[in-house]
A protein has these predicted regions:
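Active-site cavity-forming subdomains of large catalytic enzyme subunits
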Residues: 11-166, 170-173, 177
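Alpha-helical support elements that line or immediately flank enzyme active sites
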Residues: 183-195
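Anionic-ligand anchoring segments at beta-strand to alpha-helix junctions in alpha/beta enzyme folds, i.e.
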Residues: 1-13, 186-189
Length: 195
């Protein structure tokens, strides 16, 4: 819906605002560990950059998992084309968008949001196997509870902050994972800032 609008030019700026807001939140110095909830496009890189400003804190990123399939990408594209041609109203366009993105979770295709989830798991910041479990399922709930338990356990050990965990090898592993899985090319911009 926002493709081609002026606000799209602010994508990297908004990532940096997310990083700053994360760092401001952590700056109150009252945390033993932190859970990071965010999956979409520039949110995860922003959270990651902000978390590293407080590298002494253990960090666990909690994925949402991909939403279940809604309106297919082909059907959604058809409605978008019809809207661009003036054949359907804005209301029809918005109904199609809502049917395609109808629930909690990441988009149903392997774009930036799902690449973020995979990247965080490869870098050791998600619980293993948690990236692609659908929201609203008993397993997703159990993984979220276990992520909290993991953050508490990490807070008991002084050398488990995200700054101790992230190094050049971890970044390279993330890049290899992105390349091996056909991950989002948006990370060619984000991974440099994250490193």
């Amino acid at each position: 819906v926002t493709q081609g609008e002026d606000g799209m030019e602010l994508s990297l700026f908004s990532r940096d605002v997310i990083a700053l807001a994360t760092a401001v939140g952590l700056s109150h110095n009252v945390f033993d560990a932190a859970l990071f909830l965010g999956v979409c496009d520039k949110i995860v890189p922003g959270l990651f950059i902000g978390a590293l400003q407080f590298g002494h804190l253990p960090a666990v990123f909690v994925p949402a998992g991909p939403m279940t399939s809604g309106l297919s990408n082909d059907d959604k594209a058809k409605v978008r084309q019809q809207y661009a041609q003036g054949l359907v109203s804005r209301e029809v366009l918005l109904e199609a968008e809502q049917a395609a993105y109808h629930s909690a979770g990441t988009c149903t295709f392997y774009g930036t949001a799902n690449s973020n989830q995979m990247l965080m798991e490869i870098m050791g910041l998600h619980l293993p196997g948690s990236s692609f479990v659908n929201p609203g399922t008993p397993l997703r709930e159990a993984l979220t509870v276990d992520a909290v338990k993991r953050a508490v356990a990490l807070s008991q050990n002084k050398a488990t902050g995200i700054g101790y965990q992230i190094n050049a090898k971890v970044i390279v592993n993330g890049i290899v994972g992105l390349l091996a899985t056909g991950g989002s090319t948006n990370h060619t911009l984000h991974i440099v800032a994250m490193a």
